[in-house]
Curated annotation (Swiss-Prot):
EC number: 6.3.2.2
Gene3D superfamilies given in the database record: 3.30.590.20
Protein name as catalogued: Putative glutamate--cysteine ligase 2
HAMAP family xrefs: Glu_cys_ligase_2
UniProt lineage: Bacteria, Pseudomonadati, Pseudomonadota, Gammaproteobacteria, Enterobacterales
Alphabetical keyword list: ATP-binding, Ligase, Nucleotide-binding
Subunit composition and interactions: Homodimer.
Keyword Glycoprotein belongs to the record: no
Encoding gene per record: ybdK
Length: 372
């Protein structure tokens, strides 16, 4: 399928996707019932969409195009009420978190969807292992060239986004020692990590043509980069965050990305170059492994900075943009989080350290989601 022309969007408009866990009490393992839930809610959703993701244990909640985080929060709140009623009616529960702490990938059923079945044929067991749960945020752009500039700008802050959203310390019944283990699942995919370097939309079109020669790429949706342009929506999509445990934190993360995008495209503070990515995977690893306690390294100067310190600096820089787009509440909430030194991964570990089981942890996450 050829790459579509870049659809012109209103700059800084917002779209948010949350991949949720469908679980089966009282054991709280992943259920394989998302299709049943989608059938139950599809005629009751008035704004946004509830749909499939890769496997039957995943349920995606997606907003429509929103002007600001308040509109997105309203859509999510309405969807949440409908979904919570459906899971109650079907004796299921739902929660956030980037990974389920003890599910077995071998049990996961890929959705009966042509695209996902084709992906299963291409990637085999890797697709079942990709039963992990992320938050994706789309930001509108006026042109393809703006999208490429924004993508490179946002890529500088991938460690910050990962650390602030880290919520996947447990996997396959084990403490991984990572704050966010979810991104590691994609390390075997040939398109893992950052997008290959291009400097404008014309070069991106050439890159996509080259990738399509592999016969593994039919559309932009087949690319699993950390951040990717979405020409059919006219957006840049940030894909590195774990699904938060609460809607409020998900909305705050979206506000952070929207405000950062506004600052980047309004101020144009960087002259991007390929060398910017020299230490990308090392800095990304620091955020995944240590969360806010990680240390990032400047590829140009060699300077090393605590991620906590650099995140506070980012929040300060984007505060005026956040005020202009109605996202100040998100930046203030994230500032409090950074100062406290806590993320959701640490809260999960604290629960287990206090004697809680992994089954109890999932149960707690369901209660948190339902009570937010």
């Amino acid at each position: 399928m050829p790459l579509p022309d870049f659809h012109v969007s209103e700059p800084f408009t917002l779209g948010i996707e949350l991949e949720m866990q469908v679980v089966n009490p009282p054991g709280y393992d992943l259920s394989q019932d998302s299709s049943m839930l989608i059938d139950a809610v599809k005629n009751k959703i008035t704004a946004g969409e509830v749909k499939h993701d890769i496997t039957e244990s995943m349920l995606e909640l997606a907003t429509d195009v929103c002007r600001d985080i308040n509109q997105a929060a309203g859509q999510f709140s309405a969807m949440q009420k409908v979904v919570l009623q459906a899971v109650t009616d079907h004796h299921l529960e739902i929660c956030g978190g980037g990974t389920h702490p003890f599910q077995k990938w071998q049990r996961q059923e890929v959705c009966d969807n042509e695209r996902y079945q084709r992906t299963l044929e291409n990637f085999g067991y890797l697709i079942q292992q990709a039963t992990v749960f992320g938050q994706h945020v789309h930001v509108g752009c006026a042109s393809g060239d703006d999208a490429i500039y924004l993508l490179h700008g946002l890529s500088r802050f991938v460690p910050h986004f990962i650390a602030l959203s880290a919520a996947s310390p447990y996997m396959q019944g084990t403490d991984t020692r990572f704050a966010s283990s979810r991104p590691n699942i994609f390390s075997a995919f040939p398109d893992n990590g950052p997008m290959p370097w291009v400097s404008n939309w014309q070069q991106f079109e050439a890159l996509f043509r080259c990738l399509s020669y592999t016969t593994m790429i039919d559309s932009i949706k087949d690319l699993h980069w950390d951040i990717r342009p979405s020409p059919h929506f006219g957006t840049v999509e940030v894909r590195v965050m774990d699904t938060p445990l609460t809607l409020s934190h998900a909305v705050n993360m979206a506000g952070l990305i929207q405000a950062t995008a506004h600052w980047l495209l309004t101020e144009r503070p960087f002259k991007h170059q390929e060398k910017d990515y020299l230490l990308y995977k090392f800095n990304r690893f620091q955020a995944c492994r240590y969360g806010l306690e990680g240390v990032i390294t400047d590829p140009h100067t060699g300077d090393r900075r605590p991620l906590t310190e650099d995140t506070l600096r980012l929040l300060e820089k984007i505060a005026p943009s956040a005020h202009k787009i109605g996202a100040s509440s998100a930046i203030e909430a994230l500032h409090r989080q950074v100062v406290s030194g806590l993320n959701e991964a640490q809260l999960m570990r604290d629960f287990v350290a206090d004697g809680g089981s992994l089954i109890g942890l999932v149960k707690k996450h369901c209660e948190i989601w339902a009570g937010d």
